[in-house]
Amino acid sequence: GSCRMSQRGAPSTSPIIPSLSPSSGGNPSPRSSQRIDSVRVPARLPGGSDHPEYGLPLSPRSLRPYLSRGPGAFCAPPWRPDVNRLAGDVNRLFRGISTSSIHVTEDSRVLRRVLLDFYAMGYTHARPTLECWQALLQLMPEQSLPLRATLRAINSEDKYEQRFLDPPSKPPKTLFGEECEVSGDESPSEEEEASGNSTISEFSPEEESASSDFESFSDEEDDSCCTGKWSSSESDSEADVPTNPPTTRARAAQKRRGRPVPKGGRPAKSARR
């Protein structure tokens, strides 16, 4: 009978070894639901010289231990798109954000942005180097072996036919992305909080001793001097206006009211009250 030859450059797998690769389109393959520990190394991996993105070719023997355990055991050649699996994986991440994140809305936006960024990088041929892949996915060199083998297998295909994928045929029953849209969850991020706190001026005893005008307050003065409110008059913009924010002035007034009267001195009106 006729013998059907495999496509040039495509990795061939043993017929008795299941594959981690999902089927094309929206319908998952029965093999795609198998556990990762049942995945085995393809019988032949694409050859070729050293490449900036996935490095030197890997032998099946060196790749085998990393396909079933460790942080890098999330992919294996050959790869095919599976919309159902992708929708389920993204929904699991939304579930983690909705149940444990402090900034739910912000983190859900980050997840959507990451998905778009990786698609856009591939579409625009902005290909990460091997070191960049390891930094982005936080993988050690030995943990990135399955990723390297998968990328080499993808790039060994002669060409890919452009097509549009349909929505998942089996979407998750509970969409946790909808639960991430929490009203009022627009709190600033940690970076914004850190930058905002740097502008707050704290009162210190040195500032109090250096400001002699704090000791000359009386009831005849304007209330704005004691309440810490800024005045719009031009006279206040000169010597009477403190160099620190108004909250510092209010704290100084509170501390001054609780001080004991010096010996031989006459207490102020505010202290006598």
Swiss-Prot record:
Record field: compositional bias (Low complexity): 11-33, 261-273
Where composition is biased (Acidic residues), the residues are 178-194, 204-224
Pfam families to which the protein is assigned, alphabetical:
Herpes_IE68
| Regions crossing the membrane | none
Which keywords, in A-to-Z order, does the entry hold? Answer: Early protein
Origin superkingdom: Viruses
Q: Which region ranges are annotated with the description Disordered?
A: 1-57, 160-273
- Which GO BP annotation is one of this protein's? regulation of gene expression
Q: Coiled coil located at which positions?
A: none
The family line of this record is: Belongs to the herpesviridae ICP22 family.
What is the protein's name according to its record? Transcriptional regulator ICP22 homolog
What is the organism of origin for this protein? Equine herpesvirus 4 (strain 1942)
